[in-house]
């Protein structure tokens, strides 16, 4: 499977199966034989296509009468090809079209003619002008690929000028950050990875760009991908090594494994509602060699006190479910999975979780709410 075929597969998983873009991408690249150059290309196009989804759909709607008649993979092939045509200037247009045609031909004989016709029509006629959209919120929605409700909410909260600055900031390139498992190796790994020490977290290394999930150090469990701010959470619990710790909302396990790294005789109980998310925690724990410190349990975090009773844990982490809006730049698919009504329901869930877990912490214990 070549790089562009890999991109289509990842987009199918994200848009059709509801997968997380970062996890779907990491898993795909972990099992691929692509070169480092191709891995970087796949990463850029996957995140770019997901981030620009609304914009790309608007463009395609002008040349495709009914997308529901298309196989999903075919539509995502067109979407990722259009992303390259619009936003990447280092690849010749004819090469992008030719690659898309070849992929279509391999997957479904005859579909290559449709792909060729659509992409060449867009190149020949040019893209429709976004500034012709009369309704302001809709125009910003298409221009910045944001749901209309979010555009409206941000303008109401911050005013149009500042909101537009926020919209633009969502497309600034993220730095890649990792957590070094053995701090004695930090300097050595920084040189090896050509990364620099974080100014925020003592265990973090940062780099302008890079796909660490494909690196042998990641597979060996010597590094793991984790945001700098996320790495500040575990130290806040002031773990001494022998505590019984609860991670009430644990998936995918980044903070759970970080907590476990501080323990000697203690244990972390990691909760989640879904089996596939518990599996992610277990996979991370195995890779980072802390599986013996982690107990996973399928449980609604609002049922902690009902299940474990009083004084069950020395320390508790509540990484409560939230809108995730602040993570859009790093996890662009978040913005398509939320609605304004979610904010109200999330508040009730957050309070219910906190009300339950606070009854299960021992006297003198610590609860960190993040």
Language-model segment annotations:
Residues 1-370:
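S-adenosylmethionine
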């Amino acid at each position: 499977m070549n790089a562009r075929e890999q991109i289509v597969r990842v987009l199918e998983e994200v848009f059709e199966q509801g997968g997380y873009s970062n996890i779907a991408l990491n898993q795909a690249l972990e099992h691929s034989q692509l070169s480092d150059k191709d891995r970087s290309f796949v990463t850029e196009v996957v995140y770019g296509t997901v981030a620009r989804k609304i914009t790309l759909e608007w463009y395609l709607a002008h040349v495709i009468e009914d997308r529901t008649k298309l196989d999903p993979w075919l539509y995502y092939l067109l979407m990722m090809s259009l992303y390259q045509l619009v936003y990447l200037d280092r690849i010749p247009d004819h090469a992008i079209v030719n690659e898309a045609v070849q992929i279509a031909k391999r997957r479904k004989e005859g579909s290559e003619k449709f792909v060729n016709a659509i992409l060449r029509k867009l190149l020949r006629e040019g893209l429709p002008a976004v500034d012709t959209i009369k309704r302001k919120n809709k125009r910003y929605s298409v221009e910045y690929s944001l749901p209309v409700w979010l555009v409206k909410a941000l303008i109401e909260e911050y005013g149009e000028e500042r909101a537009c600055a926020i919209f633009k900031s969502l497309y600034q390139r993220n730095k890649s950050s990792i957590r070094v498992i053995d701090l004695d190796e930090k300097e050595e790994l920084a040189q090896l990875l050509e990364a620099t020490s974080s100014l925020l977290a003592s265990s973090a290394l940062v780099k302008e760009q890079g796909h660490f999930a494909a690196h042998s150090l990641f597979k060996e469990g010597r590094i793991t991908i984790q945001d700098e701010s996320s790495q500040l959470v575990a130290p806040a619990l002031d773990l001494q090594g022998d505590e019984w710790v609860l991670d009430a909302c644990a998936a995918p396990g980044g903070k759970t494994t970080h907590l476990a790294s501080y323990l000697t005789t203690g244990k972390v109980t990691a909760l989640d509602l879904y089996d596939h998310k518990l599996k992610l925690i277990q996979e991370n724990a195995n890779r980072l060699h802390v599986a013996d410190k982690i107990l996973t349990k399928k449980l609604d975090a609002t049922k902690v006190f009902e299940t474990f009773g009083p004084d069950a844990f020395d320390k508790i982490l509540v990484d409560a479910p939230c809108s995730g809006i602040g993570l859009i730049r790093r996890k662009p698919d978040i913005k398509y999975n939320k609605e304004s009504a979610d904010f109200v329901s999330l508040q009730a869930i957050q309070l219910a979780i906190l009300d339950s877990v606070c009854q299960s912490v021992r006297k003198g214990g610590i609860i960190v709410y993040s």
